[in-house]
């Protein structure tokens, strides 16, 4: 029998940071990572710069690939796999392979849930239409970049940091960009004097 088993749900920056720290503290730890998307070990803050072309390839957003996490850190990494149930009494998770539909269980001694943030989607008619995107995953960035290559104009809903970075990068690609912010100023989470600098 090996060491204790750590299951991490979410293979982006926070989840892998926790997994790496735990593995450094206990080298015998068996680490299993589940990621719903196809990419691991990336920070979503780079997505606007990928859309704008400053970061040329999607793989350049990634610090370590799933294969590198396996070979260099000894992690078991399941991409395109979603954890659909946590059985706390039996200390196992049920995972679904999103490519073939199969399910399997993974036992754990410790569990980290690092599924990241969710975009706030305003109740606007048409938000589920083609050409409407959120900015969360590498796959989102690829879809936005592909669409931006065929577009002349873009609307960005949200005047926070990510929204402004995305608006800037789309404008640098030559798109006419309109920003919509529900509150009375851009960068509403920052002090008002910062908002005035970008208005």
Predicted features along the sequence, with ranges:
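Residue-level detector of alpha-helical recognition elements and their boundaries
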Residues: 33-37, 46, 84, 126-127, ...
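Conserved phosphate-binding and hydrolysis motifs of nucleotide-dependent enzymes
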Residues: 10-15, 116, 158-163
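Short, mixed-charge, low-aromatic patches
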Residues: 21-27, 43, 96-104, 155-160
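Beta1-alpha1 glycine-rich phosphate/pyrophosphate-binding loop at the start
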Residues: 2-78, 169-193
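Short glycine-/acidic-enriched loop or helix-start segments at secondary-structure transitions
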Residues: 18-19, 43, 88, 122-124, ...
């Amino acid at each position: 029998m090996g060491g204790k088993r750590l299951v991490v749900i979410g293979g982006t920056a926070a989840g892998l940071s926790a997994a790496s720290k735990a593995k450094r503290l206990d080298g015998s730890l068996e680490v299993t990572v589940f990621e719903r998307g196809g990419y691991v070990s990336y920070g979503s803050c780079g997505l606007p710069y990928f859309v704008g072309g400053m970061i040329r390839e999607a793989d350049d957003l990634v610090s370590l690939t799933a294969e590198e996490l396996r070979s260099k850190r000894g992690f078991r990494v399941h991409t395109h796999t979603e954890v659909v149930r946590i059985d706390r009494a039996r200390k196992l998770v049920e995972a679904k392979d999103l490519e073939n539909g199969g399910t399997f269980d993974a036992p754990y001694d410790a569990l980290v849930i690092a599924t990241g943030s969710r975009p706030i989607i305003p109740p606007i008619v048409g938000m589920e239409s083609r050409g409407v995107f959120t900015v969360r995953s590498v796959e989102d960035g690829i879809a936005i970049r592909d669409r931006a290559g065929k577009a002349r104009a873009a609307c960005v809903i949200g005047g926070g940091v990510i929204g402004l970075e995305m608006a800037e990068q789309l404008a640098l690609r030559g798109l006419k960009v309109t920003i919509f912010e529900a509150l009375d100023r851009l960068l509403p989470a920052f002090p008002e004097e910062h908002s005035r600098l970008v208005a």
